[in-house]
Amino acid sequence: MKRDLLFEIGTEEIPAHVMPHLLEDLAQLAETMLKEHRLSYEKVRTLGTPRRAALIVTGLAERQEDVNTETRGPSVAIAFDADGNPTKAGAGFARGQGVDPSALIQRDGYVYASVHESGAATAELLTSLLPDLVRAIPLPNSMRWGDLDFRFIRPIRWFVALYGTEIVPFTLAGVTSGNHSRGHRTLAPADFVITSAADYEAACEKAYIIVDPERRRAMICEQITETAKACGGTAEITPDLLEEVLYLVEYPTALSGSFEEKYLALPAEAVITPMRDHQRYFPVKAADGSLLPAFITVRNGGKAHLDVVAHGNERVLRARLADAQFFFDEDRKKSLAEHREKLKTVVFQRGLGSMYEKTERLMALTTAIVEEMAAGDADGTALADARRAAELSKADLVTGMVTEFTELQGIMGREYALLDGESPAVARAIDEQYMPRFAGDELPQTPLGVALSAADKIDNIVGTFSQGRIPTGSQDPFGLRRQALGLVLMLIEQESTMLLSDLVDEACHLYDLEEFRDKMQVYVADFIRLRLKNVLSERGVRYEVQEAVLGGVDLVADVPVRAAYVERLLASEGCEALVQSFVRVGNIARSVTGGTVDPALFKAEEEGALLSAYQVAADARAEGEDTLPAEQALGRAIDTFFDAVMVMDKDARVKENRLSLLKMIDDDLLETADYSKIVLN
């Protein structure tokens, strides 16, 4: 027989950003627990709101699976004497296994004890397993509540634990399990009875609790969409805000509010940021994408007195927007260039000078990158824009608007630059320098934006590393991993020919780190290599292929290209032989220095054929052609060479020439991958 398990943990309101992870961890821990205890089940799912995390296990067996174990003991000669009687060793082994010596099995010269363990009743096991499950949930900022010697993110108020219709009894954190849950704080604050897992969602809904997050999400989206339509527009529903609101409410009701049209004269982000990031309101936009003087918010409750709720939200937003208007007006009393002077009083990082000095470095670094991107053919306008964008890049950090709303850094710089009459390219680059701001964010799209963003990120990485503040473990206070990943993704998307070593060299020069240049190159390359590894993993690249191509990361944008090529090579016919040929070359060549190859010293036609095959492959690579056919031909030439030629010729000049030929081929192959890292079946 099978029954369903319902386990609800009732708490004070848990922070919205924690709930998705809590529910995911709860499901994974439950699955692991059930498997470890030999409890078969059909399905595990979790449901939750800010005040409750619920686990439902359908089709949970009523007993553990029986298990038969067979344990090998001493040899027969040691376990029994010549008359077949158990010795002390044999009797001791049998006693340890809980069996009679006569039950020992003799096989292959050893004795074995076969033990049958009957499964325990699930209802009995759950009394200890459920408390253990709660204790195992990994939570940030867990703490003790009251005088209890128990830690959780918020105080636990109740447990519902039902196996079928039977209560699973236990006490944890001073709370005893039962079948009573609690309804919505204001709409149905009384306790209510849950009879079974099948009854759970319906019982919750009667108490104004929409416990299924996906159903609650659909309700929120539908209500927001309909409410925005009534306002004459479309709501801007961002995934992050929707996820946060989802775990702020148990019974969602969307409502609209409005604000004075005069605030629409502010830059759109200056209105949206206090609305969305500070008040958790959804902006409403017209069909042309312009902002409307309306917003949508989601109430944790019903439809009663919505006008009062809307008025309260409008009052709060009005104060926020009035602040934004004030800061904007004050900021506009100076140009962005004038604001920049104040950067002299702002510390970049301890030991790295001021933000003003940082912009001086960025001016040189961005200009150098623009010249590199243009292959030394950048025109005067491009170079002037590069200097100007870098010069003004951090000026908005000292404005009132960004001081109050830090999320607007770069965005207000762009807006103020446009109002000051700066070129659109300069203004957009000021915004794009911070991209990507978060995982999945868009990357810089303009050449100047790419240059300034790359300059800013490499300056941050090299500067912070120079002070010994390299991220370790989970500690990354300056967000260098995110910035390095952003740099990698940006260079890959742009198919940039920029070399990482050139960026580091220029940054070291500007920081006056010449004596630490070589160490810095190694540190930064290793740091970028890990970010590239993450990128390749997300793209599904095999581990050994990652290892093969990550030896050289100087040309960042080329790494995924090389990985894709190696995977295609490994999928081709005869790939095992080809890889073995390349590895064979490396086994010999990597221990030698190499020199110039002199065809006049060739004694066998296979030497010339190998050189010719190498040149064809090298030419194909230089021309950007498909090199796979040429490298397959090179592999065959390598095999023929080794079959016919003795590399270690008695003539030292011939031997060195052959080693130089192999060294040249291996060096060229290493530019694509180290094939010795490839694991062949």
Where would I find each of the regions flagged by the language model?
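Amphipathic alpha-helical "coupling" segments that flank catalytic cores
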Residues: 1-681
